[in-house]
Amino acid sequence: MRSNLLALSAGLMLFSVAAFAQGDDIKITNTWARATPGGAQTAAAYATIESTGGDRLTGASTPAAQKAEIHEMTMIGNVMNMRPLDGIDLPPGQAVTLKPGGYHIMLTSLAKPLREGDTFALTLDFAKAGERQVTVTVAKVGAMGPGGKADSGSSMPGMTMPMQH
């Protein structure tokens, strides 16, 4: 009986360690969004995500918007295209950056305008790691990074061209 209890205890400890290790597998940094100009109903959230063991970002949600979707922007010819994705693969040990002109979390039907300096909660869903909640800081309109530096558009060629969604 005692050996069964020891075996059960050891098994539970190993399970707890494995669950803890999986919980630490995802690192999310540099979470930010741009402030929205008056009346805008859409915005995008950005972050840097790293998974030590590999994972897949599969979805997102936030009280700041009715809908949050994973999107990607790409240039096709002279047209910037934005399309929803069912997920983003996170290769083991490599950081994946969600940024303007690339991967991002598209927020639609905003609950209220995003104002510079505000924060909001964002839940990211992962295939292996489950849900992770982060706090997103709102940078100025036109910011190109979490520090809030505005950009003239020169680093995003084609942004003045037609965009398809």
Region spans (language model):
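N-terminal signal peptide c-region/cleavage motif recognized by signal peptidases
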Residues: 11-18
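Short, surface-exposed loop and linker segments with low hydrophobicity and enrichment for Pro/Ser/Thr
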Residues: 5, 19-21
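Bacterial N-terminal signal peptides that target proteins for export
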Residues: 1-8
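Compact, glycine-rich, soluble single-domain proteins
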Residues: 23-165
